[in-house]
From Swiss-Prot:
It comes from Helicobacter pylori (strain Shi470). The keyword Signal does not apply. The gene is moaC. InterPro entries: MoaC, MoaC_bact/euk, MoaC_sf, MoCo_biosynth_MoaA/MoaC, Mopterin_CF_biosynth-C_dom. Keywords: Lyase, Molybdenum cofactor biosynthesis. This is Cyclic pyranopterin monophosphate synthase.
Amino acid sequence: MPLTHLNEENQPKMVDIGDKETTERIALASGRISMNKEAYDAIVNHCVKKGPVLQTAIIAGIMGAKKTSELIPMCHSIMLNGVDIDILEEKETHSFKLYARVKTQAKTGVEMEALMSVSIGLLTIYDMVKAIDKSMTISGVMLEHKSGGKSGDYNAKK
């Protein structure tokens, strides 16, 4: 399969989506941040000096989705209909799992926006509690589901 972001001279290009049909596009991505017990407890007990960590991560994730085309060179700038972020507390592993669901009516999908949303949300958590635990790990950032468009639906294997 030829790469769509290269022209005949093997130079980068942005794909022309002008002839594509506008359809509903949805993408769900997820990722996890793991930390020590002290950092986890500080977040859930709202004792972080920088402020409300999880609420700030949600706002940052929304901003990340909106700014995707400014940071990923070949991403199209598209209007987003909605970004919904959910953060699950995983007490036994001192982790948080962040989910981002992005929706649009467009000629191209929102997978990158969902992945960017997760990444920025998790990085925000790291930034806000790095004074407590610099050894935090971000892992498993992945596309869980996408629907709409020519390639159809995708569901990650569980």
